[in-house]
Amino acid sequence: NCKVALILRDLTEAGVSASDGMEDGLRAVEAAKALGVPDHAGVALFAEIRPEWSVSHNWMLTFAETLVAAGYVPGFIGNTDSSKNFNFDRQCSHYVQATDSVDELRPVYWATEPKVEGEPEEWAPYCPSALTPEEMDLWQSGVIRYGDITANEDYIRQESPLERMW
């Protein structure tokens, strides 16, 4: 049973640092519908926030609200090493606090740090300060290279995030 993570990869730093993510959310919804991804089926649409970018929790909130209103689950991929980029930690933590009592706005969290050699021996992704490592759903812990091909090495702690894939 193969699953695909649907990742919006054409975001810009100017866009994600703005206060309104509705336009990006609508683009993600349109792209999902064009692919035939069913709505109201629990499928996550991920926003990839590049490691060096600044992001606004208001952008995250309106992006997530737009996806939820269209029947999708929000997902965020971000630099979870606060020593490299404290902005994602701070803004994601503001998002967590703002949405704490709204279950449908609970996104799928995908950590990108730390990098480790090989398969991690224990579940220890870095996370925003408002979350615990156990609340990180996926962890991109490294890169695998096969000749000219490069692939991210990603892990899940439990199978439930796969239910959010298409």
Question: Which ranges hold each PLM region?
Answer:
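Intrinsically disordered, low-complexity segments enriched in small/polar residues
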Residues: G25, A69, V73-F76, V116, ...
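Short, structured secondary-structure boundary patches
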Residues: A18-A31, N87-Y109
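Substrate-binding cleft of extracellular glycoside hydrolase catalytic domains
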Residues: N1-Y72
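Hydrophobic faces of well-ordered beta-strands that scaffold small-molecule active sites
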Residues: C2-L8, V43-A47, P74-F76, D103-T112, ...
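Extracytoplasmic/secreted cell-surface and envelope-processing proteins
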Residues: E13-A18, W53-W59, S83-R90, Y95, ...
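Functionally critical loop-and-helix segments that line ligand-binding/catalytic clefts
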Residues: S93-W166
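Aromatic-lined carbohydrate-recognition surfaces of secreted/lumenal glycan-active proteins
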Residues: A70-D89
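Active-site beta-loop-alpha junctions enriched in small/polar residues
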Residues: R9-L11, R50-E52, N79-S83, T112-V116, ...
